[in-house]
Design a protein with these regions (language model features):
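A sequence-level detector of short, solvent-exposed, charge-rich linear segments
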Residues: 58-62, 112, 120, 145, ...
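Residues in well-ordered beta-strands of folded domains
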Residues: 102, 127, 150-152
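Generic signature of intrinsically disordered, low-complexity segments enriched in small/polar residues
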Residues: 9-12, 135, 152, 183
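A short pocket-lining beta-strand/turn micro-motif at the edge of beta-sheets
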Residues: 97, 120-124, 136, 145-147
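Active-site rim recognition segments
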Residues: 132-156
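Short, basic, helix/turn surface patches
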Residues: 53-58, 124-140
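Cleft-lining beta-strand/loop regions that shape enzyme active-site pockets
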Residues: 1-122, 157-165, 171-179
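Conserved functional hotspot residues or short segments at active or partner-binding sites
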Residues: 140, 156-160, 164, 170-199
Length: 199
């Protein structure tokens, strides 16, 4: 979860995601990094207006935003090998109710670290920042993100090319897309002249 992968995510969100109804973000086997807040800027940006360009449909101009944004449904996949920033991301998606999380609880290895070289002895890493859940105050260290849908792979499934967690994520995403597409839309009311109303 570094800036190179973040910029690739932002680019592919529209190059690959264009016209799609939802996306699955897979942070399984992800060792972490530092891009959760950048990802959340894309995925949780509040909407304050609807725009309609001449001859076009409803939307909002992407060039007005810090990053391209995604408001359609998402599902996050995580597992026991999701660490650090991948866990913070999974916790955030669940806490903010931005999407559903599928997989197994993450490792519970959430702590910012730094380090120093030790003369003739290598490198010593030291924790310097703890991470706590908003609302409950629970320490994310030793408390992994718990998915909405817990599903452990059975022995032999992954080597055989069967990914039951991904299948579950697809099933959940389809339900979320259906709910999203059926949500009420505000009626757009065109401006009327105040002079006409006074007559």
């Amino acid at each position: 979860m570094n800036m190179t992968s973040f910029f690739r995510f932002e680019e592919e969100l529209y190059s690959v995601g264009a016209g799609k109804d939802g996306i699955i973000i897979d942070v399984r086997e992800n060792g972490g990094g530092s891009t959760t807040d950048h990802l959340l800027t894309i995925l949780t940006q509040p909407r304050h207006a609807i725009t309609v360009p001449r001859g076009g449909g409803r939307g909002y101009p992407q060039d007005r935003k810090v990053y391209a944004s995604w408001h359609k449904p998402i599902v996050v996949l995580c597992n026991q090998n999701s660490y650090s920033n991948a866990e913070i991301f999974s916790h955030a998606i669940k806490h903010l109710k931005r999407g559903k999380v599928v997989g197994v609880p993450t490792a519970g290895g959430v702590i910012s670290t730094g380090g120093r070289s030790i003369m003739d002895m290598g490198y010593l890493r030291m924790p310097f920042r703890g991470w706590y859940l908003m609302g409950t105050g629970e320490d994310m260290e030793l408390n992994g993100a718990v998915p909405h849908y817990i599903l452990w792979p059975k022995p032999g499934e992954l080597p055989a090319g069967r990914d039951t967690q991904l299948r579950k994520a697809i099933s959940v995403l389809k339900k979320e897309v259906k709910k999203y597409n059926n949500r009420p839309q505000p009626e757009l009311k065109n401006a009327t002249s105040k002079l006409k109303e006074k007559k």
